[in-house]
């Protein structure tokens, strides 16, 4: 009991002392000083997370507004030029000035080369187009200097179109003689000494002063054999090594779904969606390789919403009296690995193929142009001027054969068309001429001939197309043919229309050759097992007299007639133009 009373007494004294101290402090010091005198130990101090106690870091707002001026060499502003960041498009004013809010994801600022100005190039020896500047953080002004063409806008010019150079890091089968002794030569070397050497000769044969431009339809490289950081630069330098000034589309193998690969292409060629003008033609190049899982992409090609938005802006700023040539890699009118909204083709001979979900929209954007439109692509490694009736309209897509053929496994594409390129002549808004130029072939040679019953390493045209095996039927492979060509057989002075084959299938000659010699490309890719290959430039004729000498005449819509004789039929499955070039053999 005494202890308890003692505790109570001590506590009472302590409380009185604390009260006395509190009163004294209150009288002697202001409140702020009291807080400083009596501090809570840090461990016991708790700060409530309120708006008043939290210190906000100032957020620096990025200003994406940019501007610039396009001037000629004399310092005069260039008016009416489309400038873009790959997301938005604006036009320069009367003084050549522009303003725009660039997208935060933009990589380049660039312009659509006007028809009356030169195509700027990377250098005098690398004549690939250089019409862009890389976006720099914090840079607000992007100016460009343009060079006027001495004679103003060109009335006529040539456009050389190259399908799939597709150089790899591997050494592909290469022969210079009718033997089985391969020569070691890289794909870049072959493209340089064969394709580009032939293009330089073609340009040299043109009338002096003829303007010549070039388009690569993509798949400039493929990293087969391993990644090579120098490969895109090597192919760019090869493509730029002639007199033509050249633009390139990006292909699926330039990317293969990898950011690194795409970045390498952009480092060398610039933006993937862009446009330029030559003569009365507006060219639009766009990346339609839509990857959805790793390297897997949609076929037919597709576009993302932001690309559609960009395309609409670009075309809205383009005069409607021009022709538009839409350039891309993967065909829009056929493909057998479709996006869910793609539409199946109605042609029974092309069952399993689809048209792009974007085709209707694209055609609606192109129809208002009074100069018409053209659809240019590559990708397939076979020549195909693909014609479909789409929503009541006849549509043709020019699918260009590959410069590399069957990815440098031979000298031919999987449809039998030789490795090569196309030469277009433009006058105003019209294509006045177009021919296929096989590498090291004379331009007058536009077809190859075969007998239906000839066995090409187990493959026959007779078997593929249900033709008689004992009638000496003549088969003509007319490389650039369309339904507008007239192909006839002349027997005993009389002309007979040849029947055109247009269906999924294979080329017996190409399938047989590649089955033996192709190393890195499977037999399935070149044969009817492909399920993708559309053969629509084969014609056949059953002779009245199986032993008659027959002349084949193929007339195109441009007034050219090409001829070949039954004396020229290919019967040897291996030691032929697919295997080696006479020109190189003679060296």
What are the language-model segments listed below?
Residues 126-135, 559-587:
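Short beta-strand elements
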